[in-house]
């Protein structure tokens, strides 16, 4: 038998070997927890398509935030559920200074000043038609007119105390417009997390159920502004545009089916790159684990580690609390 000079298995034999040479690790500080918020008091509503996730009134949000802080998770992302009577074609409620998001931000920053609060800048929770922008008589989403509303929305979030505003709408030029407005208004330290590469994906269904936009959207889609799932080079162009317009971080959405995009963006630009482990991905893992087809803990932690390996600096995931507990207990 010939002598083997290289035996890669030597570094896999024992746990200390594997731990010492592990290239990527996962910690609670890598995770961002998305939270759905609703009007009312002492209210928690289950979401059928997202087992374990609830819509929370602001008082319950503060209870949740205490747990999040104790788990060493450093950031939350807020997504509002707006009542139908407040939804309009012009999405005026999106920039109401006393709106649900704005009040939630103020409450969080008063009670947990060191917890980073990320707000979603998009109009779909606020429009009667469920699109992310204003529409013309043919239902086509109007770009520049929508950007004008997004600026107002982002400013209202910054005024409330949001640490990071996150435009997820995919309108052209909105990052530069929002950055200019923030600078001119004195919000020079407000971060912009751009959903720079957001695909027209089938994985968003449970999210739309959660925020109540699926019924408004009906049989329409968002393919005229969200990206085609078949495109990779386009993602690089979109990210480059947003970086040049003033984005501090960029988001790839969805996550797991688009790890190639996460990797390409990180390798190409070297900027803070986040990934969104979206509602459909969460629902699939939850459903499989509830049927005992997979082990939830090991599968989720492996999935999140894969995001890190691909180059993600942070992961927005509905498993954040569970993962943080598992990491803490390991």
Model-assigned labels for residue ranges:
Residues 1-22:
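N-terminal amphipathic/basic leader segments beginning at the initiator methionine
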């Amino acid at each position: 038998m010939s002598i083997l000079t290289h035996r890669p298995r030597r570094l896999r034999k024992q746990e200390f070997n594997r731990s010492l040479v592990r290239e990527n690790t996962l910690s609670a500080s890598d995770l961002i927890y998305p939270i759905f918020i609703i009007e009312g008091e002492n209210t928690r509503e289950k979401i059928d398509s997202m087992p374990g996730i609830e819509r929370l009134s602001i008082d319950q949000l503060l209870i949740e935030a205490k747990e999040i802080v104790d788990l060493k998770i450093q950031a939350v992302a807020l997504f509002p559920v707006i009542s139908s009577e407040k939804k309009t074609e012009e999405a005026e409620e999106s920039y109401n200074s006393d709106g649900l998001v704005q009040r939630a931000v103020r409450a969080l920053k008063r009670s947990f000043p060191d917890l980073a609060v990320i707000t979603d800048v998009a109009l779909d929770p606020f429009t009667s038609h469920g699109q992310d922008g204003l529409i013309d008589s043919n239902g086509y989403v109007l770009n520049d007119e929508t950007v004008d509303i997004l600026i107002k929305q982002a400013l209202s979030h910054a005024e409330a105390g949001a640490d990071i505003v996150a435009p997820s709408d995919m309108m052209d030029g909105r990052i530069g417009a929002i950055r200019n407005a923030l600078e001119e208004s004195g919000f020079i330290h407000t971060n912009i997390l751009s959903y720079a590469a957001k695909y027209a994906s089938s994985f968003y269904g449970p999210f739309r159920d959660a925020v109540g936009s699926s019924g408004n959207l009906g049989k329409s889609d968002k393919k005229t502004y969200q990206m085609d799932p078949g495109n990779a080079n386009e993602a690089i162009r979109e990210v480059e545009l947003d970086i040049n317009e003033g984005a501090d971080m960029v988001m790839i959405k969805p996550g797991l089916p688009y790890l190639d995009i996460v990797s390409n963006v990180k390798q190409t630009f070297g900027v803070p790159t986040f990934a969104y482990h979206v509602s459909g991905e969460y629902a699939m893992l939850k459903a499989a684990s509830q049927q005992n087809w997979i082990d939830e803990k090991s599968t989720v932690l492996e999935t999140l580690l894969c995001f890190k390996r691909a180059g993600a600096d942070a992961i927005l995931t509905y498993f954040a609390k569970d993962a943080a507990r598992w990491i803490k207990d390991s």
